[in-house]
Amino acid sequence: MSAKQQLRILVPVKRVVDFQIKPRVNKTLTGIETSGIKFSINPFDDIAVEEAIRIKEKNKSLVESTHAVSIGSAKAQDILRNCLAKGIDTCSLIDSVGKENIEPLAIAKILKAVVEKKGSNLVLMGKQAIDDDCNNTGQMLAGLLNWPQATNAAKVEFLDNGRVQVTREIDDGEEVIEASLPMVITTDLRLNTPRYVGLPKLMKAKKKPIEKLDIAKDFPEINIEPQLKIVSMEEPKTKSPGVKLNSVDELIEKLKEVKAI
C-alpha cells in the first residue's frame, strides 16, 4: 500500500424534499410546493456519505480527512449535523443567500473552489439530486478540475498500486474501470445502504462546529444567476383506473369503445 495517497475526501450534499413525500406543483406553476414539507438529505448523497465513512473505517491510516459541504440555506445545517453524527469529520455550509435553485454548472464551479481550498483529492457525490434529476454536476466538476471520473458507482476499491477501481452499472450490465487520484466518483443506489443514526450521536453532533461561508463574499467571481427560466410546470395527468376483463370478447368491445381497433 506504499503507493497509495493519503485521502482527503470531499462529499457534497444537498437538502431536498424527502423522497417519501409526493411532490406537488405550487400555485404559481413555477416549481414544487415547499411550504410545510419535510426535507432531508438527497438519497444519492447519503450513499456518498456512507461510502466515505466506510472507506475511512476500512482504511484508517489511508484517510486523512472527510469533509461534507452543502450549498443552500441555513436550514441545510440539519443534514450536515446528520453527516457529522454518522462519522464525517468536518462540514461546511455555503449560504446561497436566498438563491435556492442554483444551476449545476455554478454548483460545480463552487465545488471546484472548495476542492482547491480543502486540498481534496477524492470527491464522492450522489450521481444526481432527486429534485431536478440533472445528473451532471459530478461530470462538470471533473471537467473543471481536469480529473478522471467514474459515474454511477456500484462498488469502489482501492488497489495496492494506488489506483482506484470502480464498478459501475451500465445498460448492458457492469463496467469496471480504473483511475488514479485525484478523481470524482458519483454514487448509485446499489453502492451501499446508509446507516441509521441514533439520538445520542445526533445530540453530540449538535455541539460540533460547522464552517459558515457566503457565496457572495467567499465566491464573488462565480456567477450564480440562472441561465434557464422555468416557464411553467404541471403535474402529470391522472390516469384512469384499470378495468378487469373476464374474456377476450370483453377486451375487443373495450378496444372498440376507445376506437383502438
From Swiss-Prot:
PROSITE patterns: ETF_BETA. Present with 2400 molecules/cell in log phase SD medium. Its cofactor is FAD; AMP. It comes from the Eukaryota. Disruption phenotype: Displays higher growth rate and higher sensitivity to superoxide and heat stress, on nonfermentable carbon sources. Leads to decreased intracellular oxidation upon heat shock. Under conditions of mitochondrial perturbation by antimycin A, displays increased peroxisomal proliferation. GO terms for cellular component: mitochondrial matrix; mitochondrion. Its main location: mitochondrion. The electron transfer flavoprotein serves as a specific electron acceptor for several dehydrogenases, including five acyl-CoA dehydrogenases, glutaryl-CoA and sarcosine dehydrogenase. It transfers the electrons to the main mitochondrial respiratory chain via ETF-ubiquinone oxidoreductase (ETF dehydrogenase). This is Probable electron transfer flavoprotein subunit beta. Pfam families: ETF. One of its GO terms (molecular function) is electron transfer activity. GO terms for biological process: fatty acid beta-oxidation using acyl-CoA dehydrogenase. It is found in: Mitochondrion matrix. It comes from Saccharomyces cerevisiae (strain ATCC 204508 / S288c). Heterodimer of an alpha and a beta subunit. Interacts with YFH1. SUPFAM superfamilies: Adenine nucleotide alpha hydrolases-like. Keywords: Acetylation, Electron transport, FAD, Flavoprotein, Mitochondrion, Transport. Binds 1 FAD per dimer. Binds 1 AMP per subunit. The modification N-acetylserine is found at residue 2. Belongs to the ETF beta-subunit/FixA family.
